[in-house]
Regions:
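Long, low-complexity, compositionally biased intrinsically disordered regions
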Residues: 1-89
Length: 89
């Protein structure tokens, strides 16, 4: 499990890319709503109770189409940010 100190350092790095989504992702990760399945696959329980599948290589299957994309085309929604924080990336 990632410590809150380590998460805060990671969050500082994520905010320029994902903005408020990084903060919401930190809330999800800190509240234990992120679960590792296998390999690059994770499940994240969203704020409304829906469960989203996040693939570290391909992104999240949620409908947040306005989330910013990185150089690889991965959308940085709050669920993806939560997984990045939980995984210590």
């Amino acid at each position: 499990m990632t410590t809150r100190y380590a998460m805060s350092q990671q969050l500082t790095r994520l905010i320029p890319l994902a903005g408020f989504r990084a903060v919401r992702g930190a809330e999800l990760a800190a509240s234990g709503r992120v679960r590792h399945l296998a390999g690059p696959l994770w499940l994240v329980e969203g704020s409304n109770g829906a469960v989203w599948c996040v693939d570290l290589a391909a992104g999240c299957d949620c409908p947040d189409g306005k989330a910013p994309r990185d150089g690889n085309g991965v959308r940085w929604c709050k669920h993806y940010c939560a997984v990045m924080l939980a995984a210590g990336k």
